[in-house]
Amino acid sequence: MIRIRRGLDVPIAGAPEQLIHDGPRVRTVGVLGPDFLGLKPGMSIQAGERVAKGQTLFTDRKAPGICYTAPVAGRIASINRGERRALQSVVIDAEGDEEILFDRVEPSDLDGLTREQVADNLQRSGLWVAFRTRPFSKVPVPGSVPAAIFVTAIDSHPLSANPAVVLRDAHADFENGIRLLGRLTDGRVWVITRPDAGIPAGTGHAASFAGPHPAGLPGTHIHHLDPASETRTIWHVGYQDVVAIGRLFTTGRLHSERVVALGGPRTRFRGAIPRGSEGLAEALLARPELARRRGEDAALVYLLGR
């Protein structure tokens, strides 16, 4: 175990009680351009067009093999651009249940997949964009091989969901995802948790961190365990994305469901962790749970302002 001694746990009232329930029906989702540094999108859709879950919305002109896909089926409500036509968001009004199916593999055959087969399925499904590189925090270039991959199964942000609770019924998918990550690197797949979290590392290499924020940040883990450099690239990925990767390969379907923590001093029902689709509008998720004063707002992730 590595203990972080310098840091700060921000004292904010209304911490979640770590009870998961289904959130309200998703009506609007968005894929945000600023989430992807250096993105030069080539659009595959236009406003008003119907899309299926898993359908390509756009690709990166600098890396055409990577697809950015729809997390839900529905109709493209708007494509929003900013200065110099930089993509701000693609907004989808959710309706219907059409979906694109991807390659399916029996769990017993996952270890027989080649690096190219794993990468191709991830890139076509849109799950490749869950990876980030260190340094530079960009989506990895197709064909690149990281020196190691870090799975962040710990969260030290204030009012965050407990990864152990979120993963409680998804251990098999999580371990399958870790097996698949092992096909993408010749180095270690690090699985980072809190001490005694009870989260299985599977075929990965387990390590634990304790202490205040930033004990849960991937940059902290990489710095202490397997430092990156300009010539040595490390990837990191979130634990819920690893579950989605495991389910993609064993079911052939894109898993876009995510659990987020909803808390804070203005929440009416403190402790709810709604389950909703990736990319859903936070205001739609939070509105039934909040009792806010005029002129005030609530943030789902305080330290990021989002």
Residue spans of the language-model regions?
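Mobile cofactor-carrier "swinging-arm" domains
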Residues: 1-12, 17-19, 77, 82-84, ...
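N-terminal, Lys/Arg-enriched amphipathic/low-complexity engagement segments
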Residues: 1-46, 59
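Short, surface-exposed secondary-structure edge patches
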Residues: 41-42, 46-49, 65-68, 171
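Short, well-structured beta-strand-loop connectors
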Residues: 45-59, 78
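A cytosolic small-molecule/anion-sensing beta-strand core signal
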Residues: 52, 72, 238
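Short, charged beta-turn/beta-strand-edge "cap" motif at the junction between a beta-strand
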Residues: 56-65, 83
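Short, compositionally biased
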Residues: 65-81
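Buried, small/hydrophobic-residue-enriched core segments of structured protein domains
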Residues: 80-303
